[in-house]
């Protein structure tokens, strides 16, 4: 079994999650949730594209702290025209630790805290391979 090395989560002086390995913040300093909604959800027209379908598949490279996933999950849950099943596929070479998933973003408080906690509870071991977790 090949264990994956987690990214060592650090924080920049303003309190935003930072990856020393990649020399970058995990999300916009203007707010991760707003960025995910504007760039990922709206930028890809996801709610319009998944409307009234039986199922819909999203592929994301670089899961990070899961903000795009969490924003998508929240939008899917709140959408009366959502597909019956949403498949969110993501790849990550250096997954964070489950406890890192529960850290609220500095500018959004705990808007996604319930979803973060559910994700952290089911977060798989850091071993190479395919991992499947299911919600809702």
Spans of features found by a protein language model:
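Conserved acidic E/D residue at the C-terminus of a beta-strand in Rossmann-like folds
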Residues: 89-95
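Conserved beta-strand elements of the Class I
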Residues: 57-59, 89
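Short, conserved acidic/polar surface loops in the N-terminal third of protein domains
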Residues: 70-73, 99-103
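S-adenosyl-L-methionine
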Residues: 101-136
């Amino acid at each position: 079994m090949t264990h994956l090395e987690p990214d060592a989560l650090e924080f920049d002086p303003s309190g935003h999650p930072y990856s020393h390995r990649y020399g970058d913040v995990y999300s916009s300093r203007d707010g991760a949730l707003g960025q995910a909604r504007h760039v990922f959800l709206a930028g890809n027209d996801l709610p319009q594209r998944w409307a009234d379908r039986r199922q819909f598949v999203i592929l994301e490279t670089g899961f990070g702290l899961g903000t795009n996933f969490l924003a998508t999950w929240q939008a899917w849950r709140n959408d009366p025209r959502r597909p019956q099943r949403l498949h969110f596929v993501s790849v990550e070479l250096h997954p964070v630790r489950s406890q890192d998933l529960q850290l609220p973003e500095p500018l959004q408080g705990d808007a996604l805290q319930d979803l973060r906690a559910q994700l952290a509870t089911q977060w798989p071991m850091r071993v190479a391979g395919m991992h499947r977790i299911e919600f809702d």
